[in-house]
From Swiss-Prot:
Its EC number(s): 3.6.-.-
Family stated for the protein in its record: Belongs to the arsA ATPase family.
Residues the record lists as binding ATP: K22, G23, G24, V25, G26, K27, T28, T29, E249, N276
Keywords linked to the UniProt accession: ATP-binding, Cytoplasm, Endoplasmic reticulum, Hydrolase, Metal-binding, Nucleotide-binding, Transport, Zinc
Protein name: ATPase ASNA1 homolog
Subcellular location: Cytoplasm; Endoplasmic reticulum
Predominant cellular place of this UniProt entry's protein: cytoplasm
Source species: Giardia intestinalis (strain ATCC 50803 / WB clone C6) (Giardia lamblia)
Amino acid sequence: MLPSLHDILDQHTYKWIFFGGKGGVGKTTTSSSFSVLMAETRPNEKFLLLSTDPAHNISDAFDQKFGKAPTQVSGIPNLYAMEVDASNEMKSAVEAVQKETGSAADNDAESKSEGDMFGGLNDLITCASSFIKDGTFPGMDEMWSFINLIKLIDTNEYSTVIFDTAPTGHTLRFLELPETVNKVLEIFTRLKDNMGGMLSMVMQTMGLSQNDIFGLIDKTYPKIDVVKRISAEFRDPSLCTFVGVCIPEFLSLYETERLVQRLAVLDMDCHAIVINFVLDANAATPCSMCRSRARMQNKYIDQINELYDDFNIVLSPLRHDEVRGIANLRDYAETLIKPYRFCWSANPDPSSAK
């Protein structure tokens, strides 16, 4: 396979491109640089870089402030970026429902619970109570990112959406959301249709009304048919691909393997891995620590090449300066499509140095 992302750049059918991996491996730099590359290579199309990481970094990468609405990247008229603010947006939705229904969850709702008499339904309503009361629930960041994605589909404004994802665990939850949302919608629909009386009684014991929960669902959750469409597109290798990002160290390699295996279970395409922070050092390098680190890195690079022999493996060198601003992002992007020639590629045995 080619040691570059050129095939992804050249395939114009991609609607969704994800960059993900362990925290601190350069996902934001890689996704931001690739979005610049795509936009400047295809100036007649519009692209969006969407951060789904609660700890957003794309504003820092571009040295430009981005928010919850798509904002044009300075100097690149066909590239937009946005950072999903899940907490504030979800609370706004909650407040809108409370205003419409004229109610709000009782802060002491949990004390009114009748214990476990309703089993799993009680747990579901407890979660909904938190949802209504303060606009938070487990997985909220991933959920709101997914809801924003649904909105983007409806506009059909961008040729490709590039995702700067959160660390692996968050990302996997996000990728599983189409199926999860579909199940949640079906559960609530069945509850509403078949258990209206019991549901109303349980919610009353918790200081809630059906209007609270179902009103909020109507405002936030997408329609089932759109969710199914997203699920199908994520699994279509002509429309969606995932680029793993890692560094040549054990923990990052382990996390990458976990990610690739899970993507296979989700039936999502992943055929490229970018390895960042690779030392350009060999046996002739005067720095003993550099030689030692290069020896360690090369061991893991060899393992990655062996594990993923049918993947595009891209090596990006450790840089003297941080990658920040358009000029530096462009410079970094070059290593994604033009293989960098490391000094050890001519003399590939830094381990010979003691």
